[in-house]
Amino acid sequence: QLQILKDYGVTEEAMGCPVKSSMETVQIGISGVRHQPVYVDKNASEADGIILYNRIKPHTSFRGPYESGLMKMMAIGLGKQKGAESIHHQSPAIMHELVEEYGRTILENAPVLGGIAIIENAYDDTYLIKGLSPEEIISEEPKLKEISYKTIAHLLFDKCDVLVVDKIGKNISGD
């Protein structure tokens, strides 16, 4: 992770502060409905504050109020491998519920100061950047996801006999 950050220019010298990364987590709480342990990165849990930063967009595998965004970043990203495994070992049919449940638990128990939500358009250009307080993450992210649905790439036809795809991958989204 440190090498990836360095490749993006995120270094201690450039940022003027320590840049830490590890897979070590701590249990931050128990999820509200399913009573599952919720984990966050140990360094993040000890920080004065956490500012989340992520794109808000539809998820390719599940639908719900929270798909790919700040709530998922908390549930899976801040939870590192241990947090991701605790979610992915459960039924994919409830993934959207787990993302919300774990995200809410983290907001209640970790020093989250807020988040920066990014929405891109069909050309991968920034369409909208919005700062959110912890409370607004819960209320505004579903609205931002709906905006994202309207701005992502779409196939402009209902029926298709053959579709040739030039590029495909996890980093490419559309509907």
Short names for language-model regions:
Residues 174-175:
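Short, intrinsically disordered, charge-balanced linker/junction segments flanking boundaries
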Residues 2-65:
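An acidic, phosphate/nucleotide-engaging active-site surface
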